[in-house]
């Protein structure tokens, strides 16, 4: 019956880990990062759940004759913000997946 104690401990550890992961996921929802492009002329704010929360465009960069440049800056700012959001998720959730070799984590 000695193995049952180990099994109970393992189950308790798994339950604690699930609870901790849920808490970390909830915390990610409250965190945000800001990506920028064009020296800060375009800013994009993204949540820890990778949801775009805000796009800020400086008036100076809005040129009706050069919409392509504005589109490129918005795209670059979004990509920068998403990269930072990925890092935020890795920092917050990485401890749960260390050594597990799970794809996508």
Curated annotation (Swiss-Prot):
Q: Could you tell me where this protein is found in the cell?
A: Cytoplasm, Nucleoid
Which keywords, in A-to-Z order, does the entry hold?
Cytoplasm, DNA-binding
Listed under GO cellular component are:
bacterial nucleoid; cytosol
> Which spans of this chain does the record mark as coiled coil?
none
**Which domain of life does the protein's organism represent?**
Bacteria
Name of this protein = Nucleoid-associated protein EAT1b_1710
Taxonomic source organism = Exiguobacterium sp. (strain ATCC BAA-1283 / AT1b)
Give the range the annotation lists for the signal sequence: none
The UniProt regions of compositional bias labelled Low complexity, in chain numbering, are 1-16
Q: Which stretches are tagged as biased composition: Basic and acidic residues?
A: 17-26
Q: Which NCBIfam families match?
A: DNA_YbaB_EbfC
Kindly give the Gene3D superfamilies that the UniProt entry links to this protein: Nucleoid-associated protein YbaB-like domain
Assembly, in brief, is: Homodimer.
Tell me, in a sentence or two, what this protein's role is: Binds to DNA and alters its conformation. May be involved in regulation of gene expression, nucleoid organization and DNA protection.
Region of interest (Disordered), ranges: 1-26
One Pfam match, given by its short name, reads: YbaB_DNA_bd
One example of the protein's molecular function in GO is:
DNA binding
The family this protein is said to belong to = Belongs to the YbaB/EbfC family.
Q: Where is this protein chiefly located?
A: cytoplasm
């Amino acid at each position: 019956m000695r193995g049952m104690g180990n099994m109970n401990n393992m189950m308790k550890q798994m339950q604690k880990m699930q609870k901790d992961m849920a808490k970390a996921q909830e915390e990610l929802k409250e965190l945000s990062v800001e990506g920028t492009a064009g020296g800060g002329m375009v800013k994009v704010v993204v949540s820890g759940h990778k949801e775009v929360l805000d796009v800020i465009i400086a008036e100076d960069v809005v040129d009706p004759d050069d919409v392509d440049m504005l589109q490129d800056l918005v795209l670059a700012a979004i990509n920068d913000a998403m990269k930072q959001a990925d890092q935020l998720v890795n920092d917050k959730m990485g401890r749960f997946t260390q050594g597990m070799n799970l794809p996508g984590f």
